[in-house]
Swiss-Prot record:
UniProt keyword terms in alphabetical order: Disulfide bond, Immunity, Immunoglobulin domain, MHC I, Secreted, Signal
Annotated function: Component of the class I major histocompatibility complex (MHC). Involved in the presentation of peptide antigens to the immune system.
Disulphide bond pairs: 45-100
Organism, as annotated: Gallus gallus
Quaternary context: Heterodimer of an alpha chain and a beta chain. Beta-2-microglobulin is the beta-chain of major histocompatibility complex class I molecules.
Protein name: Beta-2-microglobulin
Length: 119
């Protein structure tokens, strides 16, 4: 009985450890409407599937943080990973680069995800 209890205990500890595993965010950068230079739009950065919940998401224009970014409340999925949406109004111009910078403890360094406007 002692061995069986030890096996159960080790299994439970392993499962708890897996439930709290650090998971890297999956990031999507997209606009609300099809891109058109000079036309008002909304730039979105959606990060999902990450754990732990502490994350920094910054919308960038030409490497500089964009003003007016709005952050949705942090929410979690059925598997206890987290997700967050950051968005800002903007008017795309053909000479500018738009991106989303994400910092999370599972990343060795901040990652920059560029928006592809497909003008």
């Amino acid at each position: 009985m002692g061995k069986a209890a030890a096996v159960v205990l080790v299994t439970l500890v392993a499962l708890l450890g897996l439930a709290q595993a650090d998971l890297t965010p999956k990031v999507q950068v997209y606009s609300r409407f099809p891109a058109s230079a000079g036309t008002k739009n909304v730039l979105n950065c959606f990060a999902a599937g990450f754990h732990p919940p502490k994350i920094s998401i910054t919308l960038m224009k030409d490497g500089v943080p964009m003003e007016g970014a709005q952050y949705s409340d942090m929410s979690f999925n059925d598997d206890w990973t987290f997700q967050r949406l950051v968005h800002a109004d903007f008017t795309p111009s053909s000479g500018s680069t738009y991106a989303c910078k994400v910092e999370h403890e599972t990343l060795k360094e901040p990652q920059v995800y560029k928006w592809d406007p497909e003008f």
